[in-house]
Amino acid sequence: MALTKAEMSEYLFDKLGLSKRDAKELVELFFEEIRRALENGEQVKLSGFGNFDLRDKNQRPGRNPKTGEDIPITARRVVTFRPGQKLKSRVENATPKAE
């Protein structure tokens, strides 16, 4: 099971008493701010959760799996996530729920 933005909005509606519209907007604004910061080359640090970073990857040789032909994989920028120690500890000590 995956946590969705709709489920996050529903949680805010239930726990904080926000209207469904406001809860949805809050979730959207939160993620938009993370996107904006990353687009501007900024690191995103969420205390107790983890960091989103940008990493530049160089061009490298690759291979088309169907034809075996050598093809270059272009240089690109990727987003990476490094979980914080608190998140790591909680995940390591958690007991997963059966679906």
UniProtKB/Swiss-Prot annotation:
GO MF: DNA binding; structural constituent of chromatin
Source organism, top-level taxon: Bacteria
Signal peptide segment: none
Record keyword DNA-binding present: yes
GO biological process, one term: regulation of translation
UniProt keyword DNA damage, yes or no: no
Gene Ontology cellular component list: cytosol
UniProt keywords, alphabetically: DNA recombination, DNA-binding, Transcription, Transcription regulation, Translation regulation
Entry similarity comment: Belongs to the bacterial histone-like protein family.
Oligomer status and interactors: Heterodimer of an alpha and a beta chain.
Main function: This protein is one of the two subunits of integration host factor, a specific DNA-binding protein that functions in genetic recombination as well as in transcriptional and translational control.
Protein name according to UniProt: Integration host factor subunit alpha
UniProt source species: Enterobacter sp. (strain 638)
Classification of source organism: Bacteria, Pseudomonadati, Pseudomonadota, Gammaproteobacteria, Enterobacterales
